[in-house]
């Protein structure tokens, strides 16, 4: 397999399953919760790495628990990280609600440090 370079985002997915979304100001019980690695670019890098490609992901993280999750995820998939660390932000996260009955989802993403990705990040790694 060849070389793959991905400019993308890592977010920690927080996925909640429930019978419905709560209304504003309401608290309801959910049926399950999963915390794991996500982000479209990161997911593509991991898939390509697991298939044997020589993969590098260009992104930004923070030095926090979710940033550590990203690095561990990529290490386990043989993905090299071309990472710049943000000192004034956080590693991104996503809230994912999954409807138990239909499987439909609703997602809110807070990209954090990844929102600081710039053209210089590409130039610095080319």
Question: Residues of each region from the PLM?
Answer:
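Glycine-rich phosphate/adenosyl-contacting loop at the front of the ribokinase-like
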Residues: 1-58, 68
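Conserved N-terminal subdomain of the carbohydrate kinase-like
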Residues: 26-27, 35, 50-126
């Amino acid at each position: 397999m060849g070389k793959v370079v991905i400019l993308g985002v890592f977010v920690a997915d927080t996925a909640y399953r429930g019978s419905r979304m709560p209304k504003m100001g309401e608290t309801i019980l959910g049926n399950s919760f999963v915390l794991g690695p996500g982000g479209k670019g990161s997911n593509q890098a991991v898939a390509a790495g697991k298939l044997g490609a020589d993969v590098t992901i260009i992104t930004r993280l923070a030095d926090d628990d979710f940033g550590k999750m990203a690095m561990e995820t990529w290490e386990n998939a043989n993905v090299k990280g071309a990472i710049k660390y943000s000192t004034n932000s956080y590693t991104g996260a996503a809230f994912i609600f999954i409807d138990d009955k239909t499987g439909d989802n609703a997602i809110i993403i807070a990209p954090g440090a990844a929102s600081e990705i710039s053209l210089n990040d590409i130039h610095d790694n080319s």
